[in-house]
Amino acid sequence: MVLWILWRPFGFSRRLLKLERHSITESKSLIPLAWTSLTQTLSESPGIFLLGQRKRFSTMPEIETHEGDSELFSPPSDVRGMTKLDRTAFKKTVNIPVLKVRKEIVSRLMRSLRRAALQRPGIKRVIEDPEDKESRLILLDPYKIFTHDSFEKAGLSVLEQLNVSPQISKYNLELTYENFKSEEILRAVLPEGQDVTSGFSRVGHIAHLNLRDHQLPFKQLIGQVMIDKNPGITSAVNKINNIDNMYRNFHMEVLSGEQNMMTKVRENKYTYEFDFSKVYWNPRLSTEHSRITELLKAGDVLFDVFAGVGPFAIPVAKKNCTVFANDLNPESHKWLLHNCKLNKVDQKVKIFNLDGKDFLQGPVKEELIQLLSLSKERKPSVHIVMNLPAKAIEFLSAFKWLLDGQPCSNEFLPIVHCYSFSKDANPAKDVRQRAGAVLGISLEACSSVHLVRNVAPNKEMLCITFQIPAAVLYKNQTKNPENHEDPPLKRQRTAEAFSDEKTQIASNT
């Protein structure tokens, strides 16, 4: 933070001292002894001071010490350790600069003073002057405005044009719970030095938090603050276990607000409805859903092995692709059917309720055999999405000799997008090696790895993309009469550095 301090030694020429620091501390060394003594004398002389004093509005001296951000607009210190929210305990009075102006010129003046005006939740920047009905007080930012010299040149010019005195006064502003931000409240309540949770994943009307152990004693308060400070949020929940069950959903507890977990979300132009307590949904994967969707073109085929409620299947179906979507969770299956109808793609998506391996070795195998019989010109590109990061790599074993006995076609090798977590120092290499080990073939030269997101410290979510080698799909590679020789595998561009470039997929189609 850059701070400008006005120094006027002995009442003569002013100088601005520029300090670059993160907090502001009182420093009397900048104030000459004579000035300090004078202000102390005045403060001890009520007879002198009462002439210019008002209850909440009084003249501001040119030299003023200022509290740092962490103090001036922080809740009262006695809320520290509060576990049950008491909104009345957050009342506080702060002293801020104001500018008195005629009420008829306020709107014209505010356009020029917008950057100098105070901006706090629930606080009007212009208020009535308690002592003059024909005037208004513009509340100013105490970290930008110290004296009239603190205004920008343009602002001073407008003040002069409108015949407004730049005299800065001070005003006792009463702050309440409504005027503090969620982070400020939680930072004041939780033990000093502890991490503060101010972020969450929004799922419709639900705020989904992942609280740490030291935050659990304050969980109900945290939940209520999230509801209070985020319009549209009516329920706050906390995950109480990892996603390690067969249905990919997690147990949660409602911290505050309503118990209703039926929600509706909008992602990438599509609407999804579901019971958040019974299915898996992660709003942080929105970009990844779009990335995969953009890789397919009209006429392509998508097999979504762990489809959830449809965030891959539905957008792809909208592109006039043929989609086969599967999920083992009966609730996900139910809402997948519902969302396909809701988004008017139910005629383009075939939906299954099977284990992932059974889906691959059943419907997927059958459809691939059907597609193999098509002529080269009619064969579509086939994509298989496997979004189950905790276990998806294990399911790659289902591709081993999946098409054995069928005529080998190197023009028809499905493209796999398989997701995984990694805690390795080189996560891309780790994912390649683990996937290759399951398939029994090296993927170093024919795969790309995309960083999806950072899940936790030293834990990444990645997507490895590759064409399934013919040596994996066919045990005995009987040549298709259309093919005279196997083309060499193309080396796909890697993403070791996890660049923002799109994943490049080598394809012979």
From Swiss-Prot:
The keyword Methyltransferase applies. It holds the Pfam family TRM5-TYW2_MTfase. Its main location: mitochondrion. GO terms for biological process: mitochondrial tRNA methylation; tRNA N1-guanine methylation. Keywords: Cytoplasm, Methyltransferase, Mitochondrion, Nucleus, S-adenosyl-L-methionine, Transferase, Transit peptide, tRNA processing. Gene3D superfamilies: Met-10+ protein-like domains, Vaccinia Virus protein VP39. It is found in: Mitochondrion matrix; Nucleus; Cytoplasm. GO terms for molecular function: tRNA (guanine(37)-N1)-methyltransferase activity. GO terms for cellular component: mitochondrial matrix; nucleus. The keyword Transferase applies. Residues 478-509 are annotated as: Disordered. It is an enzyme of class 2 (transferase). It catalyses: guanosine(37) in tRNA + S-adenosyl-L-methionine = N(1)-methylguanosine(37) in tRNA + S-adenosyl-L-homocysteine + H(+). InterPro entries: MeTrfase_TRM5/TYW2, SAM-dependent_MTases_sf, TRM5-TYW2-like_MTfase, TRM5/TYW2-like_N, tRNA_Gua_MeTrfase_euk. Transmembrane segments: none annotated. S-adenosyl-L-methionine binds at residues 289, 327-328, 355-356, 387. Signal peptide: none annotated. Its EC number is 2.1.1.228. Residues 1-57 form a transit peptide. Involved in mitochondrial tRNA methylation. Specifically methylates the N1 position of guanosine-37 in various tRNAs. Methylation is not dependent on the nature of the nucleoside 5' of the target nucleoside. This is the first step in the biosynthesis of wybutosine (yW), a modified base adjacent to the anticodon of tRNAs and required for accurate decoding. PANTHER family: TRNA (GUANINE(37)-N1)-METHYLTRANSFERASE (PTHR23245:SF36), TRNA METHYLTRANSFERASE (PTHR23245). Belongs to the class I-like SAM-binding methyltransferase superfamily. TRM5/TYW2 family. This is tRNA (guanine(37)-N(1))-methyltransferase. It comes from Macaca fascicularis (Crab-eating macaque).
